[in-house]
Amino acid sequence: MNQSYRKRLESYVKKTYHVEAEQLPFNNEDYAVLRHAESGKWFAVFIVKARREFGLAGDGNTEVVSLKIRDRMLSDMLMKQPGYLRGYPSSKWNWTTIVLDGTVPFEDICKWLDESYDATKSKTKNKKVPLQKRRT
């Protein structure tokens, strides 16, 4: 693999959702957010921190991505698998952090990225229009 997971994920999001990573509000290249173009809501946060800050063994830094998972039971199940951590920096149950070191396959991370994108869509976009209100 020539590119880092982060670069590959950024390319995937740009191609799939036409969204580019932003350093705002951090002004630090170690951090970036992915957000919906329409609403500005975040659906992913890339973070580089010392391994110990994530409760991981070893020295040095590691890169992670935090994503929103709608299903609490699923989120709890993921926490029991290697490469998944409780949400960082938000410890709310619906944010899950994935270590970008190859432990979690790239395809799985893309699946969770898609889930996070859907979970953070604007509520008005997600609402189903009742049949009688639809135009015919």
Located regions from the model:
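Charge-dense, helix-prone N-terminal extensions
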Residues: 1-136
